[in-house]
Each structure stands twice: as structure tokens, then as C-alpha cells.
């Protein structure tokens, strides 16, 4: 979009390197202009591009009703209003940092411990990622990221910091698992280009794959980081959204139990309450670094994106309720697995598969056989049909830097059951129509090939052509028998 007066702005503001020109964001625009509503707009676009967990918000609402003292805006909690309304230290409320550290350990099954003094707040995981980018690298330096990866990393990590993200190419033949060979290849390739590699960024569990990184791979990454003196940033915002085996393993557990000799100054964790707790509107992001200098610098930078004291106060009380948190995590897991099963089984009914996942709020859907050809252009062509005709905002794999065309991320935890059934119905209709068109096209091609393969008989008379024997070879025994 062209704006008037853009020539009066800074290069940063007027530039086009914000990362939002991706098809990932284009699908959101289609939804925003025509959003689906069960009662008022059933023909609208269904939002399946938003990784949001709305399945268990009722549990948080119930807790809030039963604990009015957790809010400073109720008669039960108003006595704390003045304290919370006044200026607070950038470190955050001590009770919030303590509760958050406790919660992070509980989410990881008590297999890792977290120090409240290392908890740094940020306005969501977006701010946390950017803060780490500013802390760990200079403009022009790079982080290696396994593909496919979250499209907004290009904005969050690069736009204002000036760093680069370089792909570690992963492939479907091994379910997109990260290997040491792929990591070394990406690292050496960057070095040959004269690019300084400052770190590795992974999402565990993976967005968009919905899979976890296993213990051995995490140990390999920590070892590689130590040997090559590069940072390892683990985005663990879906750590509490693992709903099936294998069990989740955090980098915090690995460096405590498996590679205690690694250089902890190079290890950093990003966390948030947006996904596991379904509270993206609260804008709570966390940096947890084992590096004292990073903690100090990140705290100074946190003044640009603090979490409100009122939010901290409320969450400190809720996260400290270990019994409730335990029940919430268990019930959330049950609801996530039920939704995942319903969606993937619904796809199987029309022959559509997904990468086998056990975490997250989405599925990695395989539509490769529906492509006109195996190209990124064909994938985007199919995606446009899905968004604008089927009216489902799904995200194409190319927007996640996936090199294999035909994969799509589909979010299914951000809607109620009835909307999910409408979405599945649209997918069923679309796939069946596509199958019918393909069958017709194959029949037409076969008939055309048959016609082309038949001999030409321009020299025969119309009377001869009307004979049942007209299309037989003159040397046929049946023709000779009638002559």
C-alpha cells in the first residue's frame, strides 16, 4: 500500500523489510475483510491461520470468578490498588517472577528448575525474541533456523535489529527432523559467504510442525553451540501444549541432566502465556537466560515493552495456585488431543494426511497431490483457491520457508466445535470436487490419447467408414474374411 508523505519518514519506517509481505499475513487480510460468524456471516472466511488456544478459557474464567481478590478492580482486591497502580521496577513484581518460575517448572513436569531472578518480562514472545536479537547479535550477523519456521520470526527478529535468519534445510523424508549434517551444512555455507553466525534459533515444540525436538537433538545443539561459541535460543511457548507421546523435553532439562558441561552462557529460553494458557491479549512474554550479562541488558531493554502491573498481580495469584494449574494443564491436554483427533480424522475421511504431531494448536496438512505441479507457484495458486473460494484462512508452507511445495499449516484450537465442523465440511466438499475434476480430466486425456493412437482413414469412402469394420486394419483376418 502506498502512503502519502512517505518520503518524509525514516528509512526504517518507509522500508519494505518488515516481513509482513508474506502470504501468511495476506490470509489474515482476507479474513479481516470477511470474517466468518456462525449466526451473522456463515459464508465468511474461517480463521485457521491463528495459533490461539480458546479451548480452555472457561477454566480461567471460572477461577477468576472464584478468586475476585486476584483483581485490584474488585471490592475484595481494591486494597492493593494504590500499590499496583504506582510505578514498579522494571524487574517486575517479585511475586510474579516467583510464580512464573514455578509455573515454568510445573509445565515441564518438574524436570527443570527456574530461578526467579533470571526471569525477564517482555510484551509477549514477539518482544522477547526481538530483545534477544538485540542482545546477542549485531546488524548483518545471523542466526540459523531449521525450516519450516514461524513466518513472523522474519519480522520479530530481523526488522528493527538488522540481523539475518538463515535456513537450516529440513525435509519430509525424515519428518522434517533437524540433523547435525543439515546444521553443519548451513553453518559452513554461511561462513563461506562471509556471514558471521551468532546463534541457532529453534521452536520446541515446533511451529508449524506440531512435533517436539528429542533429547539427543537438543544435546547435539547445546554441544554444537559450546564448540562453536554460538548462542542457542529455544522458543518453548508451546511447552504446555504437548498432548501425546513422546513426552516433552526442555533445553533446561537437557543442560541440567545430559550436557551439564556445556557453556550455559550461550543458552536462552523464550516463553509466553499466549499459547499454553490462551492469553495472548495479556501480552506476557518471558526471556530466561543463563547469561548474567544478557539478563542485565534484557532488563534494561524491557522498559520498551513491560507487562502491566495489574496483569502481573492477577497472574501471580493464579499461577501460584498449583492445584488449579495442574488441573488446567491436564484438562487442556485432553481437549487439545480431542480437537486434534477430530480434525485429522476428518481429513482422513477424504484421503488427506498430516504430519504426525503431538503438540501445538495446529496440524501440518499434506496437500502435495492436489498441486497442479510441484512448484511454489502452484502451492500459492492452490492456497488462493482455499482462501478466496473455500474461504478458509490456512497458511501455505512457503510462508514458513518450507522448500517442499504442498504443505499447509492449519490451526484448529481457536474455534468452537460447530465452527470446526463447518470448516471440515468445506474441506470435504473442496477435496471431493477436486477429485471429480481430476477423474474427468484423466478420462478426457485417456480418450484423447485413444483417438490420437487410432489409424487415420482419409482414403476410405463414407460408406466404408460407416461399417463396423472401418477402423480395423486392412490386414485384419476379419476384413479379409469379408472381402
Swiss-Prot record:
In terms of superkingdom, the source organism counts as Eukaryota
Tell me what induces its expression.
Answer: Down-regulated by partial submergence. Induced in leaves by infection with the fungal pathogen Magnaporthe oryzae. Induced by phosphate deficency.
EC number(s) given by UniProt: 4.4.1.14
| Presence of the UniProt keyword Flavoprotein in the record | no
Q: In the UniProt record, does the keyword Lyase occur?
A: yes
Residue numbers bearing the N6-(pyridoxal phosphate)lysine modification? 275
Q: What class of enzyme is it?
A: lyase
Which protein family is it in?
Answer: Belongs to the class-I pyridoxal-phosphate-dependent aminotransferase family.
Q: What is this protein called?
A: 1-aminocyclopropane-1-carboxylate synthase 2
Q: Which gene encodes it?
A: ACS2
